[in-house]
């Protein structure tokens, strides 16, 4: 019985070796006669190639090429400490304390410049912004202007140049312009600013709910803090990680330096 198994094994081994040799030849010669390659050899070869191709495709998927492409598109937030400048009208009284808490929590330095009753015209005809940019060297700027221009007639014509001047002074510094917290319909200040700034640089506050102070105009401190939170949440979705502003545990803070300017007569 053992001899029978050994003979059968030798026969199978010889046959396999024979077919292997045949598979490497385009033609076969037996006793000087040239024969075509057997179909079975071609089919076996095709099957082997197909199987190898499928295996290579699976390996390619496992390399994580698709995952690498997704990683390239992910937003990477700049975690370096920044100098932040926020300037504008009296709305900063509510916005600055909450922004200061964010700045402190994330290792940034905040400079706040409040110019009471100021407008785009006041800032656009002054050199103050250029002076503060030169002095504080901000890496990021927040603008809060427009509340004192809610009802200016023909604002698109009369204030356009001033908005453009402010943006020119800001230059290449990343910024967000926070629109006024409308308590009534405006005559076009929001549209004017929106028209002049690139997409993702203007936060439209109009339409939000605000709890108002006794003057019925300014948001309460608590409501202004939520307003600032809304701005920063919006930034996370619309800006490409220009500055880290993770939410602080403290409700408010104090700017590293605050400058107040009185209304222009």
Label the predicted regions.
Residues 87-121, 221-265:
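Mobile, glycine- and charge-enriched loop segments
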